[in-house]
Amino acid sequence: MGLFTRDLQSLDDLFMHGLKDIYYVENQIVKNLPKMIEAATDAELKKGLKQHLGETEEQVRRLEQVFELLGDDPQGTRCPGIDGILKEGDELLANVDGRKATNAAIVAAAQAVEHYEITRYGTLIAWATELGKEEVVPLLERNLREEKAADKKLSAVAEARVNKGSSRRARKTGGRSTKRKVSRAPVKRKRPVARRCAS
């Protein structure tokens, strides 16, 4: 989010820039989530991602309502932050070997996105409140609640299913101990020497 530009001279400027930022973010997520859904092999994870795709599409529509309430046309501002997070997620998935490890990587990538969104929505709500834009706060708060709920569901799936499956596979394959048993030669014990008592 490129906040430090000459065009941003007031809190209202910051708010509108942030709104365009999150609008871009949500649209990028709509484009990227199908790849995660296709790659996921855990049934619960796939189901949760599909549900969140529908939520994200609805979040885009809510943001368009926010623009409309503010008398502006919906438009996005390219966000290097989310571009970097999504690229890192793609690279992580491309380098992961094994179905269960892939599911864990998907959760990690998805939660990185969720945490970014949660931060952005929290900031926008605070700015909207300060600027007296109360009419848009409920829409932003609804999006924030959904992001927090999605993050919580991802954590639950990871703890109950995905991470356990990945760790079990690691123990069976790549998680073997690298310590070698050292064979030691038997220690020869010296027989005690009988000493004569001095008479």
Predicted feature locations:
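Amphipathic alpha-helical hairpins
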Residues: 1-199
